[in-house]
Design a protein with these regions (language model features):
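Rossmann-like NAD(P)-binding element
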Residues: 1-30
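Rossmann-fold dinucleotide-binding core
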Residues: 30-100, 108
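N-terminal alpha-helical segment
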Residues: 14, 63-64, 114-115
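Short alpha-helical
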Residues: 12, 38, 105
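NAD(P)-dependent Rossmann-like dehydrogenase/reductase catalytic/cofactor-binding core
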Residues: 75, 79-82, 89-102, 113, ...
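A ubiquitous short alpha-helical element
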Residues: 3, 100-105
Length: 180
């Protein structure tokens, strides 16, 4: 059995959920989080099965961007890590193993600084969101600029992710909070 939790990036809400879920699940159940930033070690003890708890983060628009990141924590049994990689491959995802716990995993570790750069350009008065997005899309051929990405993931999710990072530019986090 496999349970995939896909809640907002809210640490306390996830802890509360796992505390309620753990007593009603059969011990054989593997539990994974679809978190894109939070570390599985933060929640493992609340699941009642730390050896069967890890992360399986699906990229946005998985029907098109069929990629997932698989990350264990120190108590995860390697057998379940390997089984989760196989499961992801079986459902036609490109399973990318993350070998060490890292906030942001692979994708968001690269994406968040890029998003913050776009916000910084706007907050600093360098340009407007439309021009910033056009600079990125026309300059790189990418389908979306940073502000379109914010529209895709939602401002609340973006804010929660950004707040997980230690070096948030001082002007950016208040802007995101205001936009929510």
């Amino acid at each position: 059995d496999l349970i995939i939790e896909s809640m907002a990036e809210d640490t306390q809400a996830k802890i509360d959920f796992y505390k309620k879920l753990a007593p009603v699940l059969p011990q054989k159940t593997v539990v994974v989080t679809n978190s894109s930033t939070l570390l599985p070690s933060t929640f493992a003890k609340y699941t009642g099965r730390p050896e069967k708890y890890l992360s399986l983060h699906f990229a946005n628009s998985i029907w098109k961007n069929n990629m997932t990141e698989v990350m264990a924590q120190s108590q995860t049994d390697k057998r379940y890590f390997d089984e989760l990689v196989d499961f992801a491959n079986d459902i036609r995802m490109l399973a990318l193993p993350v070998n060490k716990e890292k906030n942001g995993y692979l994708l968001n570790s690269m994406l968040v600084p890029w998003l913050l750069s776009g916000l910084d350009l706007y907050v600093s008065g360098v340009s407007d969101p439309k021009s910033i997005d056009l600079a990125w899309t026309r300059g790189t051929g990418a389908p979306k600029g940073p502000f379109r990405v914010f529209d895709t993931v939602g401002i609340q999710t973006a804010y929660n992710i950004v707040m997980q990072y230690q070096k948030v530019p001082s002007l950016v986090s208040p802007l995101l909070k205001k936009m929510m």
